[in-house]
Swiss-Prot record:
InterPro entries: Glyco_trans_25. Pfam families: Glyco_transf_25. Belongs to the glycosyltransferase 25 family. Keywords: Glycosyltransferase, Transferase, Virulence. One of its GO terms (molecular function) is glycosyltransferase activity. This is Lipooligosaccharide biosynthesis protein lic2B. It comes from Haemophilus influenzae. Involved in extracellular lipooligosaccharide (LOS) biosynthesis and virulence expression. Involved in the synthesis of the oligosaccharide moiety of the LOS molecule by adding GalNAc. Its EC number is 2.-.-.-.
Length: 266
């Protein structure tokens, strides 16, 4: 029987209470994994495992998030686990989530122990082009091959073989190529990624963007980082206006095409 690890800061009392309620409602066992935060400990771990991450163009919070996931991967590798289930502490669980998170037989039927895979339980409610690889559906959900890039690392299971290869790839990257952990997993490494559809979990902020109760310090930090912009000039204003027709066309395209490739949450 596997353990569902939920990455959470020890000080995130509201989020931990949320997870206790969310998982206990379906009798899903889990353990909190104390999330790393900007500190001497974080710096020490980065220096030991991924030195180039120190100079990556990420916020300190993003580096802490990166290493929290990475250290769980190392736990999978060091304890010789066939796979490890990892979640973040703002997830909402769908119906019958216990069938996927409290049982192992379905996963062992879908994949071999020697397979290299990352299986997303999460839907980010964005464009997610998938292919049917003829894996047997389970409990009303399909297991599809994810063929498009994606983002979000709030709910997934990763195999030991994938941990081994992805860790080696990450350690080979220069600081300029080290991105947020989810982008490396589902953009750069997407040849080994799969998607449960409909999604088993979703981040609160993706499902209820206008009614977020579980506020994120990481997201606040990221938005501050992104909001540092140069003063707009007449040239940039004119360029922006010239691009408006393209934006309108993109909206139409999203409605007609992209909406057909969104993994639903149920």
């Amino acid at each position: 029987m596997h353990i569902n690890y939920v990455i959470s800061l020890t000080s995130a009392y509201q989020r931990r209470e949320h997870i206790q309620k969310e998982f206990s409602q379906q009798n899903i066992p889990f353990e909190f994994f104390d999330a790393l935060k900007p500190s001497k400990e974080l710096t020490s771990l980065i220096e030991k495992f991924i030195p180039n991450l120190l100079h990556a163009k990420l916020t300190e919070g993003e580096k802490a998030c990166f290493m929290s996931h990475y250290m769980l991967w190392q736990k999978c590798f060091s304890e010789d686990l066939p796979y490890i289930y990892i979640f973040e502490d703002d997830v909402l669980l769908g119906e019958n989530a216990d069938k996927f998170l409290a049982e192992d037989e379905w996963l062992e039927e879908a994949f071999k122990q020697t397979d290299k895979f990352i299986l997303r339980f999460e839907t980010f409610l964005n464009f997610s082009k998938c292919k049917d690889k003829k894996i047997k559906p389970y409990s009303g959900r399909k297991i599809l091959k994810l063929v498009s890039e994606n983002c979000g690392a709030a709910g997934y299971v990763i195999s030991r073989e994938a941990v081994k290869q992805l860790s080696a790839h990450i350690c080979s990257l220069t600081s300029n190529h080290l991105l947020a952990i989810d982008l490396l997993m589902f953009n750069i490494f997407n040849q080994s990624t799969y998607q449960v559809s409909p999604g088993v979990c979703v981040q609160e902020g993706q499902l209820y963007p206008k009614d977020i109760k579980l506020h994120s310090q990481l997201e606040t930090e990221r938005q501050k980082y992104l909001s540092v912009k140069k003063k707009r000039t007449l040239k940039t204003v004119l360029i922006s206006l010239a691009g408006k027709p393209k934006k309108i066309l993109r909206k139409i395209y999203r409605k007609l095409f992209i909406s057909k490739h969104i993994v639903p949450f149920r």
